[in-house]
Amino acid sequence: MADNPGLPTDTENPSTTFTGITAEQFLTQYAIRQRISDAIETGYTDNELLAYINDAINMTWGVMIQMDYDEIAGYMTMTERKMEIPKDYWMPTGKPPVQRHNHMLYCYGDLPCTFRYWTRPKFLRTLQDTLPQGMAWFNPALLNLVAQMVVTLAMQNHGFDMGAEMDFTTSIAKLLPK
């Protein structure tokens, strides 16, 4: 747990102790396959469902950036003028004296230079991959919204009218605290 400071550490309460949830567990726990009404019986492949989960993660991640969720930010201190970009780096949250070129960051200001950056979400390639880690992603309300988004995206892409469901999901998302 020490490697994941954003995760709950209350080991006396299993419902608040997370080690990760795989795509397969997510599909099962949130009954995604059962919730998708496939009246035209086209079926949804694992790869399609993974793509819908990734789309939902990406949309949620974008909203979390707009809402300035610190849970999806990283912090970096540059002690040298040139450093390799961390694997989870996406972009700085502000305007630090740092430039990105290929896989390197260059500091043109005073050292050491500490700045905050948005992390890149982890996308799923297989059913055994885990959803993004961190307290924000393991909020049950957020996982329910991601599940509803997956169902809505899957059904919309197969021609079902999901306008009301998407409006409902959007309304609930607006109620979540920052």
Regions flagged by a language model, labelled:
Residues 2-178:
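Glycine-enriched, solvent-exposed interface loops adjoining structured elements
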